[in-house]
């Protein structure tokens, strides 16, 4: 069975109630590829608003979740709280949190495990810096990040994960991996899944690309055999997000 195309929109720390209402209203009224799974991740304060507004084709994701149950963790969100508000997805490991907030591989792995244990699906973000790519360490970096998660998440639980390869040097910079670069890394991730998790996981788990995805480059990327969709940043705030969702039409 072919893997279902997946497009996530990470709004990051952008938007107001008015602008997010406008974005979701436009998505609800747009003609969207019915064979594409769509998930949007607004700022935490607008999660409930987004969930109330979104129609059946658009699911809502948190941008972050903590690895502990409810308790004395100021400023954090628990899996239980997200589930209480009927949020079904969360991001984990986005490079902005890895770099700016110094979240290491093990912390990301614990968050992923906590989310899955609590019934959430996870968009697991991995990727290398420009220095790591120039040093030829791209595959080493992404497999190290995946290995940490594999220490926490059992093979049977990986069906709750979508892997998002986001080269740090391409996020918000206007630079984008070539189709060949993206396919090479995605194929390596698929190989890792086959060897470390299971052949079934390699066949079924979606590996999506993020990093300056636009309406101009999405179709070439979507045509690659191991690119199963996108995690879109800035472009998810614009009308062009619809074009990216429809990249395979």
Swiss-Prot record:
Positions of the catalytic residues: 94 (electrophile), 166 (proton acceptor)
Post-translational events: The N-terminus is blocked.
GO biological process terms held by the UniProt record: adhesion of symbiont to host cell; gluconeogenesis; glyceraldehyde-3-phosphate biosynthetic process; glycerol catabolic process; glycolytic process; regulation of entry of bacterium into host cell
Annotated PROSITE patterns: TIM_1 (PS00171), TIM_2 (PS51440)
Induction: Preferentially expressed in yeast cells, the host parasitic phase.
An example Gene Ontology CC term for this record: fungal-type cell wall
Catalyzed reactions: D-glyceraldehyde 3-phosphate = dihydroxyacetone phosphate
This protein's UniProt keywords: Gluconeogenesis, Glycolysis, Isomerase
Record InterPro entries: Aldolase_TIM (IPR013785), TIM_sf (IPR035990), TrioseP_Isoase_bac/euk (IPR022896), Triosephosphate_isomerase (IPR000652), Triosephosphate_isomerase_AS (IPR020861)
Top enzyme category: isomerase
Binding site for substrate: 10, 12
Pathway annotation: Carbohydrate biosynthesis; gluconeogenesis; Carbohydrate degradation; glycolysis; D-glyceraldehyde 3-phosphate from glycerone phosphate: step 1/1
Top-level taxon: Eukaryota
E.C. numbers: 5.3.1.1
One Pfam family hit: TIM
Keyword Calcium: no
Sample GO molecular function, one term: extracellular matrix protein binding
Classification via Gene3D superfamilies: Aldolase class I (3.20.20.70)
Protein family: Belongs to the triosephosphate isomerase family.
Subunit structure comment from the entry: Homodimer.
Protein name: Triosephosphate isomerase
